[in-house]
Amino acid sequence: MDIPQKFFRIDPIENVIYIIREISIMERKLFGTNGVRGIANEELTVELALDLGKTIASLREGLIAVGMDTRLSSPMFKSAIIAGILSAGGDVVDVGITPTPSLQYYVKESKANAGVIITASHNPREYNGIKFVNNDGTEFTWEQDAEAERVLMSKLFKKAHWNGVGRVYEDDANRIYIEGVIRKVDVSAIADKEFKVVLDCGNGAATFTSPFILKELNCKTFSINCYPDGRFPARQSEPVEENIWELKEVVKSVKANLGVAHDGDADRATFVDEKGNFVSEDVILALMAKHYVEKNGGGIVVTPVSSSKCVEDVVVEAGGKVIYTAVGSPVVAKVMMETNAVFGGEGNGGLIFPEHLLARDGGMSMAKILELMAIENKPLSELVKDIPKYHMFKTKVECRDKKKLLEGLRSEFENANFTDGARIDFEDGWLLIRPSGTEPIARIFAEAKNEKRAKELLEFGVEKVKKILSGYSEITKFS
């Protein structure tokens, strides 16, 4: 494979490439790894949303699609975004409550020149966010977000004449998205199995798409929390194992073939096997990456440095190549596009199927797992049993000074991999410390074959972050 000059090889293993981060999120004040986020009416205000609407209409002429999740503050922000777009002369197609991938797919398939989704994804209910979408359905890249922030800060917006303000239209993005998902899977193979599926929409936007996808696939669906409620009364929005205990219990009680859980905007999906066991997001990523490499007779898989080594193991063994990027779906999608990758995704349940959409897609992930179960004629527990076993632990530490943390990490770990944050590799595991792009926290990941060792690495990472942020000068030796 020809490696473009911007690719920086730092790993001696053949078929493994790392890409250095091209623009630091630290250079931007408002835009993080997933647009602009903050606590509604405190950090993210109506005034800011209005200006963001003016910003996107100043950057992209013509029709702009606007959608939102189920959060209580989303209608307020949607109104402000639309007002800003109209004032700058842009037209709006209002698609209402819709998952992020549904909005993105709609923009790709329609005449819209851009999109805006109002969502804070998996963040707590008091948060909300605003994210821009290109006309090919991809999220704005870091460079595009930086450009948007410059326009926003300058206040040099377009301003329409009284008879040139935009108009508002409406359309059904969810119907178009559902049809798009169905076209990309083997419907007859899935339908013949008559799978029993327990679906937990988490009171989010998946309520308007995933049940209908399962219906089209002839699945018998047992629904949990599949009604819109921006208070998220049943569980926290993030579909991690500790939040979806009810899903696990229902899968066992009804003897279902599969359990599926979504986050607030349904760009992610996590899974429970037929025994009621949670299947880790990295294992699902590895399973699907292996499938796509085998199906294509090789190819490139793109994933962030935070992903489990099990992904690399199965991809290389199947004859594929792995490209590691910084954390964040926009950069993963961008590199997938540039390298014609066969598959990509993050180890948080966000999988990217390039034949459908270069963006994370929880609904498509659900359909593709069912398809794999059908064509292989195996339950999920059997499909994942040969994926290499690693122990990964994740945690987060409050971090109000991200610049100080990064400077401290560079000082203490000179030989670390700084693709995104600091990844320190040991003979028997690795540790990643990176400031979040959406919250005032530092995320810490540790992985090893041995559970005890993984926990030791995690504890070391937490201790190191706290010492750097407190200004404690002692350097802890660890190997």
Q: At which residue positions do the language-model features occur?
A:
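N-terminal amphipathic/basic-hydrophobic helices that include classical n-h-c signal peptides
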Residues: 1-25
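An N-terminal, well-structured beta->alpha segment
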Residues: 17-89, 113-114, 166-197
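N-terminal small/polar loop signature for handling phosphorylated ligands or for N-terminal nucleophile
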Residues: 54, 58, 64-128, 213-272
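Phosphate-binding and adjacent anionic-ligand microenvironments
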Residues: 258, 296-479
